[in-house]
């Protein structure tokens, strides 16, 4: 089973951040549309099961 911490889109939350929790991170994916490029972010934990956007580090 692959987890979020093995994904290239997983970024850990720094300890000095307001929303810091142990093993918490953000899943950040890049999207493109007719207006340009943008990024989507959602909170996840290291041990969550990976989603369909998984990309090995």
Swiss-Prot record:
* One Pfam family, short name: BssC_TutF
Keyword match Lyase: yes
| pH dependence, entry free text | Optimum pH is 8.0.
Q: InterPro entries attached here?
A: BssC, BssC_sf
* Description of how activity is regulated: Activated by the benzylsuccinate synthase activating enzyme BssD. Rapidly inactivated by oxygen.
What pathway does the UniProt record associate with this protein? Xenobiotic degradation; toluene degradation
Protein induction: Induced by toluene, probably via the TdiR/TdiS two-component regulatory system.
**Keywords in alphabetical order:** Aromatic hydrocarbons catabolism, Lyase
Its GO biological process annotations read: toluene catabolic process
Q: Which reaction does it catalyse?
A: toluene + fumarate = 2-benzylsuccinate
What would you give as a GO molecular function for this chain, any one? benzylsuccinate synthase activity
What is its EC class?
Answer: lyase
Enzyme Commission numbers on file: 4.1.99.11
Thylakoid among keywords: no
Instruction: Describe the task this protein carries out.
Output: Catalyzes the addition of fumarate to the methyl group of toluene, leading to the formation of benzylsuccinate.
What does the annotation say about its assembly with partners? Heterohexamer composed of 2 alpha subunits, 2 beta subunits and 2 gamma subunits.
Q: Mind telling me what this protein is named?
A: Benzylsuccinate synthase gamma subunit
Source organism of this protein record: Thauera aromatica
